[in-house]
Design a protein with these regions (language model features):
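Short hydrophobic alpha-helices and adjacent helix-cap/hinge residues
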Residues: 2-328
Length: 328
C-alpha cells in the first residue's frame, strides 16, 4: 500500500519474501500494528457515535487496541485545521483514514490521492467532489452516506402540526452536505404546501442569533444534518421552547438533546457499516475506487415527548405508538 511507513529487516531477502507472501497488506505497519487516522470536523454526538461504531466494529473483527493504533483528531469546525490534520496523517504514514463529515472528507481528499480514505456522515459524496459516482467512486475514497429522508422529515412536521405554513431552515451555506439537503427540502416543501425561510449560519457562535431572527416569521424550525448548527443545537432548542416553535431535526441524537422529532438513521450503525467496508480494504486489498458508496436502509421515527410539550405541541397518539425511540 502506498505511503505506508518504511520498515527494515535484517536482510533484504527477508523483506522480499514477506512482500511476496503478504502483498501490500497494511498489517505490515511498524511494530505489527495498523495505523488509522480518524478526523472529524467538529465534536457533536452524531459524529461521535459514527466514530465509536467504526472502532467497535473493527474491534469485533479482531482489530482491537492490540492490533490498531488510532490517531484521533478534531478540526473544531475549521477547514484549515482539517487540512493540517490530513497532512499530519500523510507525514505520519497512516495506513488508512476515516474522515467523518463532508468538510473533513474534502480536506483529506485534497491532501492524499493514495492512502485509502473511508468517509462517513457525508451526505452527497458526488456533490462534494469526493467521488466520480456513487456506484464507482474512481478515487481513493469510499464509505457511507448519511443522506437522511428530508422529505419524510417535513412530512412528519405536517403530520404533527398540519396548520404549519412557514418553516425556518437553519444551515451553513459553506457545507456542501447542507446545501444538498436544502435543495431536497425545497422540492419537498412545494409538494407539502410549505414555504421555506432559509436562515444561513456562518459559524456556531451565531446559531442563537440566527435562530432568534426566525421568531415571528415562521411556524416551525428545521435543522438538517448541518455540522455547524448541530454543534450548537442547544441554542436553537432554547429559541424553539421560548417561542413555542416545533423543532424538527435531521438525526436521532438531536432529538435526545431536546429537539422534538425526526425520521432518521442511526449514526452508530453507520459507523459500523463503514468499518465493514474498511475490512474489505484491510483483509482483501479491495480498491476504494471500485467500492460503491453505501447507505443505511433502515430509518426510525424518534420523538421527544418533553421537548414537544415545552414547544407547545401535543404529539398525535398514533405517532407515539409508531416511534422506534422515545425520549422525555
Amino acid at each position: 500500500m502506498s505511503e505506508m511507513r518504511r520498515w527494515t529487516m535484517s536482510t533484504g531477502l527477508a523483506v522480499l519474501l514477506l512482500i511476496g507472501l503478504l502483498g501490500s497488506s497494511p498489517i505490515l505497519a511498524a511494530e505489527g500494528k495498523l495505523k488509522i487516522g480518524i478526523t472529524q470536523i467538529v465534536e457533536h454526538p452524531a459524529l461521535d457515535a459514527a466514530k465509536q461504531g467504526f472502532i467497535d466494529e473493527l474491534a469485533a473483527f479482531g482489530y482491537d487496541e492490540s492490533k490498531v493504533v488510532y490517531d484521533m483528531q478534531n478540526a473544531q469546525g475549521d477547514f484549515a485545521t482539517a487540512q493540517a490534520i490530513a497532512e499530519k496523517f500523510v507525514s505520519g504514514s497512516v495506513d488508512l483514514i476515516l474522515a467523518i463529515a463532508t468538510p473533513t472528507a474534502q480536506a483529506t481528499a485534497n491532501v492524499t490521492q493514495t492512502i485509502p480514505i473511508l468517509i462517513t456522515a457525508v451526505t452527497d459524496p458526488v456533490a462534494a467532489g469526493l467521488v466520480e459516482s456513487i456506484e464507482r467512486p474512481g478515487t481513493n475514497v469510499t464509505g457511507t452516506s448519511d443522506l437522511t429522508p428530508v422529505a419524510k422529515q417535513l412530512e412528519l412536521l405536517k403530520a404533527i402540526r398540519p396548520e404549519t405554513k412557514r418553516v425556518g431552515v437553519l444551515y451553513n451555506p459553506g457545507e456542501a452536505n447542507s446545501v444538498v439537503q436544502l435543495e431536497l427540502a425545497r422540492d419537498a416543501a412545494g409538494e407539502l404546501g410549505l414555504a421555506l425561510v432559509e436562515i444561513p449560519v456562518d459559524n456556531s457562535s451565531s446559531v442563537y442569533q440566527s435562530a432568534q431572527s426566525a421568531v415571528g416569521r415562521v411556524d416551525a424550525l428545521y435543522v438538517p444534518t448541518d455540522n455547524t448548527v448541530v454543534s450548537a443545537l442547544e441554542s436553537v432548542i432554547i429559541v424553539a421552547e421560548n417561542a413555542k416553535l416545533p423543532l424538527i431535526v435531521g438525526e436521532t441524537d438531536s432529538v435526545r438533546r431536546g429537539a422534538m422529532a425526526t425520521i432518521s438513521i442511526d449514526y452508530y450503525s453507520l459507523g459500523r457499516q463503514t468499518a465493514r467496508m474498511a475490512l474489505q480494504i484491510l483483509e482483501k486489498n479491495a480498491d476504494p475506487a471500485s467500492m460503491p458508496i453505501e447507505y443505511l436502509e433502515n430509518v426510525e421515527l424518534v420523538l421527544n415527548l418533553g421537548a414537544a410539550k415545552r414547544m407547545g405541541v401535543e404529539l398525535p397518539t398514533e405517532l407515539v405508538a409508531e416511534a422506534s425511540q422515545i425520549f422525555d
